A protein has these predicted regions:
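Metabolite-binding pocket within alpha/beta catalytic cores that recognizes anionic/polar moieties
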Residues: 1-128
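Flexible, glycine/charged-enriched surface loops at secondary-structure junctions
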Residues: 31-36, 136-141, 231
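Short acidic/glycine-rich loop or secondary-structure boundary segments that cap or lie
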Residues: 88-90, 106-108, 148-153, 197-198
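Active-site rim beta-loop-alpha module in soluble metabolic enzymes
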Residues: 119-167
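Generic non-transmembrane alpha-helical segments
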Residues: 129-136, 178, 224-231
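A C-terminal functional module that forms or caps the active site or interfaces directly
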Residues: 154-160, 166-197
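His/Asp/Glu-rich mid-to-C-terminal helical/loop segments that flank catalytic regions of hydrolases
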Residues: 198-231
Length: 231
Protein backbone atom coordinates (compact mmCIF):
# COMPACT_ATOMS: atom_id res chain seq x y z
CA UNK A 1 0.00 0.00 0.00
CA UNK A 2 3.11 2.20 0.24
CA UNK A 3 1.92 4.15 3.28
CA UNK A 4 4.05 5.39 6.17
CA UNK A 5 3.18 5.57 9.86
CA UNK A 6 2.78 9.31 9.43
CA UNK A 7 -0.03 8.64 6.91
CA UNK A 8 -2.02 6.49 9.29
CA UNK A 9 -4.80 7.08 11.79
CA UNK A 10 -6.37 4.46 14.04
CA UNK A 11 -9.56 4.03 11.98
CA UNK A 12 -9.73 2.70 8.42
CA UNK A 13 -12.39 1.80 5.89
CA UNK A 14 -11.43 -0.71 3.22
CA UNK A 15 -13.28 -1.15 -0.05
CA UNK A 16 -12.65 -3.45 -2.99
CA UNK A 17 -13.05 -1.11 -5.93
CA UNK A 18 -10.60 1.83 -6.17
CA UNK A 19 -13.50 3.89 -7.58
CA UNK A 20 -15.44 3.36 -4.34
CA UNK A 21 -12.78 5.40 -2.55
CA UNK A 22 -14.35 8.43 -4.27
CA UNK A 23 -17.78 7.47 -2.93
CA UNK A 24 -16.46 7.39 0.63
CA UNK A 25 -14.67 10.71 0.06
CA UNK A 26 -18.05 12.38 -0.59
CA UNK A 27 -18.81 11.92 3.12
CA UNK A 28 -15.47 13.39 4.25
CA UNK A 29 -14.02 16.85 4.64
CA UNK A 30 -10.41 17.92 4.30
CA UNK A 31 -9.53 14.73 2.48
CA UNK A 32 -6.35 14.21 0.51
CA UNK A 33 -5.11 11.44 -1.73
CA UNK A 34 -2.20 9.47 -0.34
CA UNK A 35 -1.06 6.71 -2.71
CA UNK A 36 -2.26 4.66 -5.67
CA UNK A 37 -0.21 1.52 -6.24
CA UNK A 38 -1.67 -1.47 -8.08
CA UNK A 39 -5.16 -2.04 -6.61
CA UNK A 40 -4.31 -0.12 -3.44
CA UNK A 41 -5.64 3.44 -3.58
CA UNK A 42 -5.74 5.45 -0.37
CA UNK A 43 -6.87 8.77 1.00
CA UNK A 44 -7.24 10.34 4.41
CA UNK A 45 -10.05 12.62 5.49
CA UNK A 46 -12.29 13.74 8.33
CA UNK A 47 -15.81 12.66 9.28
CA UNK A 48 -17.42 14.65 12.11
CA UNK A 49 -13.99 15.62 13.49
CA UNK A 50 -12.75 12.01 13.30
CA UNK A 51 -9.87 11.24 10.95
CA UNK A 52 -10.33 8.18 8.75
CA UNK A 53 -8.07 6.36 6.30
CA UNK A 54 -9.77 4.88 3.21
CA UNK A 55 -8.06 2.14 1.21
CA UNK A 56 -9.06 -0.05 -1.73
CA UNK A 57 -7.90 -3.67 -1.71
CA UNK A 58 -8.97 -5.08 -5.07
CA UNK A 59 -10.79 -8.39 -5.39
CA UNK A 60 -10.37 -11.37 -3.09
CA UNK A 61 -8.73 -12.49 0.12
CA UNK A 62 -5.01 -12.39 -0.84
CA UNK A 63 -4.87 -8.69 -1.68
CA UNK A 64 -7.19 -7.88 1.25
CA UNK A 65 -4.83 -9.68 3.62
CA UNK A 66 -1.86 -7.72 2.27
CA UNK A 67 -3.75 -4.50 2.94
CA UNK A 68 -4.73 -5.56 6.47
CA UNK A 69 -1.19 -6.62 7.36
CA UNK A 70 0.28 -3.38 6.06
CA UNK A 71 -2.38 -1.27 7.80
CA UNK A 72 -1.48 -3.07 11.00
CA UNK A 73 2.19 -2.27 10.41
CA UNK A 74 1.47 1.47 10.34
CA UNK A 75 -0.69 1.45 13.47
CA UNK A 76 -4.32 1.09 12.34
CA UNK A 77 -6.50 -0.28 15.17
CA UNK A 78 -9.97 -0.58 13.60
CA UNK A 79 -10.91 -1.64 10.07
CA UNK A 80 -14.39 -1.75 8.59
CA UNK A 81 -14.94 -3.25 5.16
CA UNK A 82 -17.59 -1.59 2.99
CA UNK A 83 -18.27 -3.85 0.05
CA UNK A 84 -20.76 -5.77 -2.04
CA UNK A 85 -22.49 -9.08 -1.40
CA UNK A 86 -24.86 -11.52 -2.99
CA UNK A 87 -27.81 -12.55 -0.83
CA UNK A 88 -28.29 -16.16 0.23
CA UNK A 89 -31.87 -15.80 1.46
CA UNK A 90 -35.08 -14.80 -0.27
CA UNK A 91 -36.49 -11.48 0.85
CA UNK A 92 -33.18 -9.63 1.06
CA UNK A 93 -33.66 -6.87 -1.47
CA UNK A 94 -31.17 -5.02 -3.62
CA UNK A 95 -29.48 -2.32 -1.57
CA UNK A 96 -30.23 -3.95 1.78
CA UNK A 97 -27.23 -3.74 4.12
CA UNK A 98 -25.85 -7.14 5.13
CA UNK A 99 -23.63 -7.16 8.24
CA UNK A 100 -21.70 -10.29 9.09
CA UNK A 101 -21.80 -11.70 12.61
CA UNK A 102 -19.31 -14.32 11.43
CA UNK A 103 -18.01 -15.80 8.20
CA UNK A 104 -17.61 -19.25 6.72
CA UNK A 105 -13.97 -19.32 5.60
CA UNK A 106 -14.52 -20.87 2.19
CA UNK A 107 -11.34 -19.27 0.84
CA UNK A 108 -7.79 -20.50 0.46
CA UNK A 109 -5.91 -17.60 2.02
CA UNK A 110 -7.03 -17.96 5.63
CA UNK A 111 -6.15 -21.65 5.63
CA UNK A 112 -2.54 -20.53 5.28
CA UNK A 113 -2.90 -18.61 8.56
CA UNK A 114 -4.99 -20.84 10.83
CA UNK A 115 -6.62 -24.30 10.95
CA UNK A 116 -10.02 -24.78 9.34
CA UNK A 117 -11.66 -24.97 12.78
CA UNK A 118 -10.63 -21.39 13.61
CA UNK A 119 -13.68 -19.09 13.59
CA UNK A 120 -13.86 -15.87 11.60
CA UNK A 121 -15.76 -13.32 13.68
CA UNK A 122 -15.82 -9.52 13.80
CA UNK A 123 -15.31 -7.24 16.78
CA UNK A 124 -18.20 -7.59 19.22
CA UNK A 125 -17.79 -3.90 20.09
CA UNK A 126 -18.11 -2.68 16.51
CA UNK A 127 -20.94 -5.13 15.83
CA UNK A 128 -22.91 -3.85 18.83
CA UNK A 129 -22.47 -0.26 17.62
CA UNK A 130 -23.70 -1.24 14.15
CA UNK A 131 -26.84 -2.80 15.63
CA UNK A 132 -27.59 0.49 17.41
CA UNK A 133 -26.93 2.61 14.33
CA UNK A 134 -28.48 0.33 11.71
CA UNK A 135 -31.20 -1.87 13.22
CA UNK A 136 -32.69 -2.24 9.74
CA UNK A 137 -29.65 -4.12 8.40
CA UNK A 138 -29.69 -7.89 7.91
CA UNK A 139 -27.41 -9.58 10.48
CA UNK A 140 -26.10 -13.12 10.34
CA UNK A 141 -23.40 -15.43 9.07
CA UNK A 142 -21.91 -14.82 5.64
CA UNK A 143 -19.65 -16.89 3.40
CA UNK A 144 -16.36 -15.71 1.94
CA UNK A 145 -15.14 -17.54 -1.14
CA UNK A 146 -12.59 -17.33 -3.96
CA UNK A 147 -14.48 -17.32 -7.25
CA UNK A 148 -17.39 -15.66 -9.03
CA UNK A 149 -17.99 -17.91 -11.98
CA UNK A 150 -18.00 -21.45 -10.64
CA UNK A 151 -19.93 -24.10 -12.57
CA UNK A 152 -21.66 -25.21 -9.36
CA UNK A 153 -22.58 -21.75 -8.00
CA UNK A 154 -26.29 -22.50 -7.78
CA UNK A 155 -25.78 -25.73 -5.83
CA UNK A 156 -23.19 -24.15 -3.53
CA UNK A 157 -25.41 -21.19 -2.74
CA UNK A 158 -28.40 -23.43 -2.03
CA UNK A 159 -26.22 -25.60 0.23
CA UNK A 160 -25.16 -22.68 2.40
CA UNK A 161 -28.56 -21.02 2.27
CA UNK A 162 -30.00 -24.14 3.88
CA UNK A 163 -27.75 -23.48 6.89
CA UNK A 164 -29.20 -20.00 7.28
CA UNK A 165 -26.35 -17.96 5.83
CA UNK A 166 -27.49 -14.54 4.67
CA UNK A 167 -24.94 -13.53 2.03
CA UNK A 168 -21.54 -14.04 0.48
CA UNK A 169 -18.50 -12.01 -0.53
CA UNK A 170 -14.80 -12.67 -1.07
CA UNK A 171 -12.95 -10.71 1.64
CA UNK A 172 -14.75 -10.68 5.00
CA UNK A 173 -13.35 -14.01 6.18
CA UNK A 174 -9.82 -12.75 5.60
CA UNK A 175 -10.60 -9.47 7.34
CA UNK A 176 -12.01 -11.17 10.43
CA UNK A 177 -9.24 -13.78 10.60
CA UNK A 178 -6.17 -11.65 9.95
CA UNK A 179 -7.62 -8.80 11.97
CA UNK A 180 -8.17 -11.07 14.96
CA UNK A 181 -4.63 -12.44 14.73
CA UNK A 182 -3.16 -8.93 14.62
CA UNK A 183 -5.33 -7.45 17.36
CA UNK A 184 -7.37 -5.24 15.03
CA UNK A 185 -11.09 -4.63 15.60
CA UNK A 186 -12.99 -5.47 12.41
CA UNK A 187 -16.45 -5.34 10.89
CA UNK A 188 -17.87 -5.98 7.42
CA UNK A 189 -20.82 -3.98 6.10
CA UNK A 190 -22.02 -5.17 2.70
CA UNK A 191 -24.43 -3.78 0.12
CA UNK A 192 -26.59 -6.51 -1.41
CA UNK A 193 -26.18 -6.30 -5.19
CA UNK A 194 -27.47 -9.76 -6.19
CA UNK A 195 -30.81 -11.10 -4.95
CA UNK A 196 -30.88 -14.78 -4.02
CA UNK A 197 -31.71 -16.98 -7.02
CA UNK A 198 -30.99 -14.05 -9.38
CA UNK A 199 -28.49 -14.45 -12.19
CA UNK A 200 -25.05 -13.25 -11.10
CA UNK A 201 -24.42 -11.40 -14.35
CA UNK A 202 -27.71 -9.52 -13.95
CA UNK A 203 -26.64 -8.45 -10.48
CA UNK A 204 -23.24 -7.30 -11.72
CA UNK A 205 -24.97 -5.35 -14.49
CA UNK A 206 -27.20 -3.64 -11.90
CA UNK A 207 -24.10 -2.59 -9.98
CA UNK A 208 -22.26 -1.30 -13.04
CA UNK A 209 -25.26 0.48 -14.57
CA UNK A 210 -26.15 2.21 -11.32
CA UNK A 211 -29.45 0.68 -10.21
CA UNK A 212 -31.03 3.22 -7.82
CA UNK A 213 -31.47 0.72 -4.99
CA UNK A 214 -27.87 -0.42 -5.32
CA UNK A 215 -26.59 3.17 -5.32
CA UNK A 216 -28.62 4.05 -2.23
CA UNK A 217 -27.43 0.84 -0.56
CA UNK A 218 -23.82 1.78 -1.19
CA UNK A 219 -24.36 5.20 0.37
CA UNK A 220 -26.05 3.65 3.39
CA UNK A 221 -23.26 1.12 4.00
CA UNK A 222 -20.66 3.89 3.86
CA UNK A 223 -22.70 5.99 6.28
CA UNK A 224 -23.10 3.09 8.72
CA UNK A 225 -19.36 2.39 8.69
CA UNK A 226 -18.43 6.01 9.34
CA UNK A 227 -20.99 6.32 12.13
CA UNK A 228 -19.73 3.12 13.79
CA UNK A 229 -16.16 4.44 13.76
CA UNK A 230 -17.35 7.80 15.08
CA UNK A 231 -19.48 6.37 17.92
Amino acid sequence: IQLKKTDAVEDAIIVGDPARVDQVAKFLTEFRELKYNREFRSLRGTYKNKEVLVLSTGVGAPSAAIAIEELHNIGVKRIIRVGSAGALQLGIGLGNPIIGEGAVRDDGLTKMYVPEQYPAVPSSTLLAKAKEIAPEAIYGIIRSHDGFYMDNNEQTQEYWSNFGLIGEDMESGALFTVGRLRGIETLSILNNVVAYKEDLQAGVNDLVSGDDKVIEGEKRTIEIALEVLNK
